[in-house]
Amino acid sequence: MAQAGTSQILENIRGAVEAGVDWVQIREKDLPARELLELARQAVQVAAERREGNPRLARIIVNDRLDVALAAGAHGVHGVHLGHESLDAGDAIRWCRAGNAPAGFAIGVSCHSLEEARKAESAKAGYIFWGPVFETPSKLQFGAAQGLVKLAEICRAVPNMKVVAIGGVNAENAASCIQAGASGIAAIRMFQDSDHSKEINNVVASIHNLSSEQKSG
């Protein structure tokens, strides 16, 4: 893993954690296992340093690599996110819940349809990423943007599931996802734009406030 690449990833994590995010997903699944494990450990350290004294410590999850997430668990990694090319979510969840993962180990699943969302709910996933909600070049393989109306439908269909909106989410439309019923949002480019850090901080604070209002309402 090139040092420059590692430094940029950790800098992006610092910015996101400073903005007040609850979760950071390590997406470099193509790294060799040892390098990915080391990156996850460093991410945990960054999160702890940047949120010192703050009870809302950002939690770290690893994309796809259940083996690395479990190996890094002792160092503070909190879970794994399973995409469409990952292990079967039901199999992974049953195996982890059989005493093979730490208590509280989160397992999230990417979903792109109502059927997939209900399947994840039946498997007792901790949360789902659902989308793409908006147009985005990074999600073209999953079809056209599905929009806020469909997002709201998904949230109503799986009321006991935390639904995280993904796909084209930015500073302008993030709040509308929460208003549609999502528990949170996931984004990449928004948190990589260091030129708008104050705006991002405001967006994250707004999402936290809206989420609190949704729960209390």
Where are the model-predicted features located?
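Conserved N-terminal beta1-alpha1 strand-loop-helix module at the mouth
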Residues: 1-88, 93-126, 146-149, 153-163, ...
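A short acidic, helix-capping loop that chelates divalent metal ions and anchors anionic groups
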Residues: 26, 134-140
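Flexible, Lys/Arg-rich cytosolic regulatory linkers and terminal tails that connect or flank
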Residues: 130-131
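Glycine-rich ATP-lid loops
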Residues: 143
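C-terminal binding/interaction regions
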Residues: 185
